[in-house]
Amino acid sequence: MDLDVLNMFVIAGGTLAIPILAFVASFLLWPAALIRIYYWYWRRALGMQVRYVSYDDYQFCYSYRGRPGYRPSILMLHGFSAHKDMWLSIVKFLPKNLHLVCVDMPGHEGTTRSDLDDYSISGQAKRIHQFVECIRLNRRPFHLVGTSMGGNVAGVYAAQYPEDVCSLTLICPAGLPSTTESKFVKQLRELQESRCIDRIPLIPSTPEEMADMLKLCSYVRFKVPQQILQGLVDVRIPHNDFYRKLFLEIVDEKSRHSLHENMSKIKAPTQIIWGKQDQVLDVSGASMLASAIPDCHVYILENCGHSVVVERPRKTANLILEFLALVHSSDNNKKQA
């Protein structure tokens, strides 16, 4: 082989090897950094832009795509200990001309965390209302989506600020009394009885506990490498003290059944999406909401757990779009009549 040709292959091989070795080193040595880069890249690929806005001295962090148009804007509220990027799997399947806003909930990720703040469900709903006013999202009624803790907040928000919300999607929301005890609720009861409340299953501090949490939250069994589990834990550990405080706040008597206490006040057309195999919040909550909210549409997803957004992103996105089309069509018919 000609020496110049051989040198070309060596140089090309070396050029390819450098990013591969960098990736392997990051995977083995800095998995948490790799996870952050992953979210950064995914946001860019989907066209989501990150912005900050302040209400007095309180800062909100959010991502958005598109501009307000003839269809309602969509505001998405994530669950306990998550962040705005958890919605990216659904954003992938939503039209680019829809105006989407994903906000970090109070105390999470880039939104202000303060020991003096009120992290009860009603307190969080007030903060989200401040955010909505800051970005003037409520110039027109918008579609509100929330999952788990975010679903609890979304339902309370729709009840307390009905003029802001034209329609509502609640994905396996918290805030309802349990008619059937889920695996998670049973674990909590056992921890309370043994006085080991610090070992909350949703607040892992080791890769093994992270694997257990993923099994609890998901019906689909994802094969997650040990290093990624370690990275997921490393990202969360600095925040675990806050997560414990927040968890005790939202399961306190003031917030535990907030959605149940407010569901009869919800006037907006409402969509309920729930995984049939949810082990965190029992699926029986769907029928409870359906019996209290006048215009309520329930969708139970087979072979799906609590992490609906991760397990069934395409289906969830399609259900939201179909529901919006139904509500939008109904509104147009009323105007024409």
Predicted features and spans:
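Active-site loop/oxyanion-hole signature of alpha/beta-hydrolase fold enzymes
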Residues: 55, 63-64, 101-145, 161, ...
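Gly/Ala-rich beta-loop-alpha elbow adjacent to hydrolase catalytic centers
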Residues: 146, 150, 154
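Flexible "cap/lid" loop of the alpha/beta hydrolase fold
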Residues: 155, 159-160, 164-205
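Alpha/beta-hydrolase fold catalytic core
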Residues: 1-74, 96-98, 133, 137, ...
